[in-house]
From Swiss-Prot:
Active site residues per record: 165 (proton acceptor)
Documented EC number(s): 2.1.1.266
Keyword vocabulary terms for this entry: Methyltransferase, RNA-binding, rRNA processing, S-adenosyl-L-methionine, Transferase
Biological process annotations from GO: rRNA base methylation
Family matches, as InterPro entries: RlmJ, SAM-dependent_MTases_sf
Cross-referenced PANTHER family: RIBOSOMAL RNA LARGE SUBUNIT METHYLTRANSFERASE J
Organism: Haemophilus influenzae (strain ATCC 51907 / DSM 11121 / KW20 / Rd)
Record's protein name: Ribosomal RNA large subunit methyltransferase J
Domain of life (superkingdom): Bacteria
Gene that encodes it: rlmJ
Reported function: Specifically methylates the adenine in position 2030 of 23S rRNA.
Gene3D superfamilies recorded: Vaccinia Virus protein VP39
Alphabetical list of HAMAP family matching this protein: 23SrRNA_methyltr_J (MF_00934)
Lineage, opening ranks: Bacteria, Pseudomonadati, Pseudomonadota, Gammaproteobacteria, Pasteurellales
Length: 281
């Protein structure tokens, strides 16, 4: 079943959190001259038009990137992220397009770095391929992203980031995430892994945390932003990023960023945030 389309959700609060974390990790990898490898397991189309029927139907971006767009007091790290999105909008004042994780990563790649983008959805893959057809550093595959973790690691660069962000439309995705991490870590223990997760039902989310703890892997950081308290009702109340082998600066950076994000994205005052270690070093 491949019914999920990210265009309904592009630019929402979950994307904001995910893409700021992605940017900070890639910026850290760029501190060394040696090239790195980036794998995006569930790439989507890479770029989203916010005037599309899907985006307008939900309007989720208005409570995400839309609430940061005109802010004049952005913390430095958030300002760099917003600047990237404004570049995609041709520097204009109007927010018309939003970047998916592949486009944010491609913007940060240097000539010595490379990326592999995988997307299995039959209608999304051709768009993704077309969006990166001129980028020599980027390879696009129509394939199962979970399987690519095992197939492509370790990379020849011996440095890199794996982003795993499935839609979780299948309950198996929660277990497949943990399995992919186990397979990847066995092959590439020094790599950084970033897992995006939604909080729809907290018990499902805990399956990822418990599964990762059971692997025995160390240095697992959890970063979470909630827009409202957990609920038994259907709907995403929060989202987060689990980062294995995070840059040493990431914990501090997110603790500085999240109070501002929570206040700005959730002006109603129902938001909260967490930065904590699932397993320390």
């Amino acid at each position: 079943m491949l019914s999920y389309h990210h265009s309904f959700h592009a630019g929402n609060h979950a994307d904001v959190l995910k893409h700021i974390v992605l940017m900070l990790i890639l910026e850290n990898l760029k501190l060394k001259e040696k090239g790195f490898f980036y794998l995006d397991t569930h790439s989507g189309v890479g770029r989203y038009r916010l005037s599309s029927n899907e985006s307008e139907k939900t309007g989720e971006y208005k409570e995400g990137i839309g609430r940061l767009w005109d802010q004049t007091d952005l913390p430095e790290d958030i300002a760099r992220y917003v600047k990237m999105i404004k570049k995609l909008n041709y520097g204009g004042k109007e927010l018309r397009y939003y970047a998916g994780s592949p486009l944010i990563a491609a913007e940060l790649l240097r000539s010595q770095d490379r990326a592999l983008l995988t997307e299995l959805h039959p209608s999304d893959y051709p768009i993704l391929r077309n969006n990166f057809s001129d980028d020599k550093n980027v390879t696009v595959k129509c394939d199962n992203g979970f399987q690519q973790v095992k197939a492509t690691l370790p990379p020849k660069e011996r440095r890199g980031l794996v982003l795993i962000d499935p839609p979780y439309e299948l309950k198996d995705d929660y277990d497949l995430v943990v399995k992919a991490i186990e397979e990847g870590y066995k092959r590439f223990a020094t790599g950084t892994y970033a897992i995006w997760y939604p909080v729809v039902l907290r018990q499902q989310t805990k399956r990822i945390f418990k599964g990762l703890e059971a692997t025995g892997i160390r240095k697992i950081l959890k970063i979470e932003l909630a827009v409202r308290p957990d609920s038994d009702q259907r709907g995403m109340t929060a989202s987060g990023m689990v980062v294995i082998n995070p840059p040493w600066t990431l914990e501090t950076q997110m603790k500085e960023i999240l109070p501002y994000l929570t206040k700005t994205l959730v002006p109603e005052g129902t938001g909260s945030w967490t930065v904590e270690w699932i397993t320390p070093e």
